[in-house]
Amino acid sequence: MRFCWQKSIHGS
C-alpha cells in the first residue's frame, strides 16, 4: 500500500 502515506498528508 503506497497510498498509505497519501492518506497521512490528507489527514494532516
Swiss-Prot record:
Biological process (GO), any one: nodulation
Protein role: Modulates the action of auxin, and may function as plant growth regulator that alters phytohormone responses.
Q: What is this protein called?
A: Early nodulin-40
> InterPro entries, from UniProt?
ENOD40 (IPR013186)
Keywords, alphabetical: Nodulation
Task: Provide the taxonomic classification.
Answer: Eukaryota, Viridiplantae, Streptophyta, Embryophyta, Tracheophyta
